[in-house]
Amino acid sequence: TLWDAEGKEYIDFAGGIAVLNTGHRHPKVKAAIAAQLDNFTHTAYQIVPYEGYVSLAERINAVAPIEGLKKTAFFTTGVEAVENAVKIARAYTGRSGVVAFSGAFHGRTMMGMALTGKVVPYKVGFGPFPADIYHVPYPNALHGVSTDDALAALGTLFKTDVDPRRVAAIIIEPVQGEGGFNICPPAFMQALRALCDDHGILL
């Protein structure tokens, strides 16, 4: 339950945009935050790594279902993570293209807005946006877009707008929030994985 400055009560069904799944001000979360305050006063890990950062990264690396070398980095916001994912994908592949989906929301920075798949309310009055960003329909039966339709749109994009050999990454939300809480069909995710593997595109 949340209370505003005028005393109105609200039930938070969104969990603070899905980051408060234990509830607002959960005692265990507050205790963990307080304990961390005793461990450091500066959290810029790129300047001086600290134990909590390194140990959490090592724990994630230990359980990540990836073979070979693994690295973990933490970021302050979702859009910061997205921007760094795009930079890493472009640096790793040597390619510049990125494909995103209609209805997607990836943040309010210029790159985040470029990747976002809705004009209103995020893109109105801004721009120009970073180049080499492409959008295709998100598979959503409620909007009349089947898995086959979305895959066909990707095929058309690769024939008409961008060679897949120029695409560094495809970014997708398995569950869209801003787009309407749409769940991506598993068959589409599997086909997307295969398509990315065929073309050397990161997903």
Where are these regions (language model features)?
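Active-site and channel-lining beta-strand-loop segments
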Residues: 1-11
